[in-house]
């Protein structure tokens, strides 16, 4: 067996970097949704786990503690959905060659 061709290895590394940049761009465009309290609180987050929107049913605004609990639950729900979408995109890009959880940790998006 001969040594691997350094030029081929560099091309593969460059391709992998380009794929990961594509994934980063895709994550910017993805939106995940979460809700709690039967839809009384709804949130949307990006694939990069940034909060995009928050909607609270005005009828529950007089119960601050409940609103706080529902917001936390809805945001966590949306963040979990966002992480799942990110893993899916990374898996597609990597073609099974890398562990998506490792990539998400490196991007500060994993648990």
Curated annotation (Swiss-Prot):
Look up the domain of life of the source.
Answer: Bacteria
Q: Which UniProt keywords apply?
A: Cytoplasm, DNA-binding
Q: List the disulfide bonds.
A: none
Q: Name one GO molecular function term.
A: DNA binding
GO CC annotation: bacterial nucleoid; cytosol
Q: Where in the cell is it found?
A: Cytoplasm, Nucleoid
Spell out the subunit comment: Homodimer.
Family recorded in the similarity comment: Belongs to the YbaB/EbfC family.
Q: What does this protein do?
A: Binds to DNA and alters its conformation. May be involved in regulation of gene expression, nucleoid organization and DNA protection.
HAMAP family per the UniProt record, alphabetical: DNA_YbaB_EbfC
Q: What is this protein called?
A: Nucleoid-associated protein Clim_0875
Q: Upper taxonomic classification of the species?
A: Bacteria, Pseudomonadati, Chlorobiota, Chlorobiia, Chlorobiales
